[in-house]
């Protein structure tokens, strides 16, 4: 397998757009799968994504667009998946081309709903992609700041760290610093959990809890994350590293965080449906909450923050009541 070969971006949202910008800082050209032909036409005409990160300009002559997933896969060696996890299976149903000989990078910060599996496991289980040919791209990195070329740090995790290093070099730039890891499962689970905890932080903000309590919440969240990771995927990891703690902090505190925004709306009294409609963007943590809750039924890890968010979102228990109970459990 020649790496990276031809790279394809699989998705058309803000994070996909930011990753395309990162790739084109190093690559001569890329392939790009978007499901909507009208978006592709507008992109070519305007020179930017018409719906997301509209300030990022592209030389469209360096991009081969297509709404046909099979054509893109056939013409590519490395596939970077950036579709929201709730829609991944729908996209993949259109795929007739085998991908087991491709290199897969998942930048999806979610779990496949209903299956309750992390994305790397999904590609191995459903499509026969060997684990050593799957990498995870994660870290405290908002798409909006990549667009502004603000210094950001990303981690590429793969069981084969030599392959991870190849992509770390190709994705790095003057504004993107990269590191490598082999903790694929741990990083994927932490990427899901930090969205859940960002919703919790948003709910508390909507309820007018202050910065002092937010600090306590996040401190307890990283402990809860560590307990879960050590139970589900035991490994000698340091959760203080930026790909774990850093990603949790930026997602929990930043105004760019859609999960925090979603939680804030819930804390202010919005229903789940009304918050989702008004946001017009996917808050992955909503789906991740239910998935982790189901997974934890097999492990019985003490996760009071996850339980509180689940009760608020899915059991429709008052945020005020749930968060008050949560405050009594913190130290």
Report each predicted region and the residues it spans.
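NAD(P)+-binding Rossmann beta1-loop-alpha1 motif at the extreme N-terminus of oxidoreductases
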Residues: 1-56, 63-67
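Internal alpha-helical scaffold of NAD(P)-dependent oxidoreductase catalytic cores
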Residues: 87, 98, 126-133, 151-238
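A short helix-to-beta-strand connector/capping loop
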Residues: 56-65, 129-133, 174-176, 301
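Rossmann-like NAD(P)(H) cofactor-binding subdomain of soluble oxidoreductases
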Residues: 66-74, 78-151, 167-169
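NAD(P)-dependent Rossmann-like dehydrogenase/reductase catalytic/cofactor-binding core
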Residues: 194, 201-205, 230-331
